[in-house]
Amino acid sequence: MGSRALLLLKATTAETLLFTSKSTFSKALIRNSTRSFSTRSALLPPDLPRLAETARISLTPHEVEEFAPKIRQVIDWFGQLQAVDLQSIEPSIRADTEGDNLRDDSPETFENREAIIAAIPSYEEPYLKVPKVLNKD
């Protein structure tokens, strides 16, 4: 049995079942999900074991049970933010404002180019090759 199956066996509450992507409860919740702005958010919590794997941390089944309600609470806070009516408020910062403050994307030459090349593990003209950071397939 994999770790997901083990979590399903240990899951005793509906809250815990939300965090297992294989559960029929979470699939039914996804299918029947509607947007409502109550104190409970309509946003679904993430698959906690997968989130931990992506963050490169290991969680015990006890920690999954401990963090599940805390993550649910954070998601509920986001639901409360979504319920705020912002139609009458003028935005102060917008993505489409004029006046780009970005510099021109132009190549630069460095005075000590050879020192940079000597400091990296692999060099293939004109690229500096570095080791893989994420080993996802």
Curated annotation (Swiss-Prot):
One Gene Ontology biological process: glutaminyl-tRNAGln biosynthesis via transamidation
Domain of life: Eukaryota
Record Gene3D superfamilies: Glu-tRNAGln amidotransferase C subunit, N-terminal domain
Key words of the record: ATP-binding, Chloroplast, Ligase, Mitochondrion, Nucleotide-binding, Plastid, Protein biosynthesis
GO molecular function terms attached to this record: ATP binding; glutaminyl-tRNA synthase (glutamine-hydrolyzing) activity
Primary residence: mitochondrion
Listed GO CC annotations: chloroplast; glutamyl-tRNA(Gln) amidotransferase complex; mitochondrion
Documented EC number(s): 6.3.5.-
Keyword Transferase: no
General function of this protein: Allows the formation of correctly charged Gln-tRNA(Gln) through the transamidation of misacylated Glu-tRNA(Gln) in chloroplasts and mitochondria. The reaction takes place in the presence of glutamine and ATP through an activated gamma-phospho-Glu-tRNA(Gln).
Subunit structure: Subunit of the heterotrimeric GatCAB amidotransferase (AdT) complex, composed of A, B and C subunits.
Family indicated by similarity: Belongs to the GatC family.
Further information: This protein may be expected to contain an N-terminal transit peptide but none has been predicted.
Name the record gives this protein: Glutamyl-tRNA(Gln) amidotransferase subunit C, chloroplastic/mitochondrial
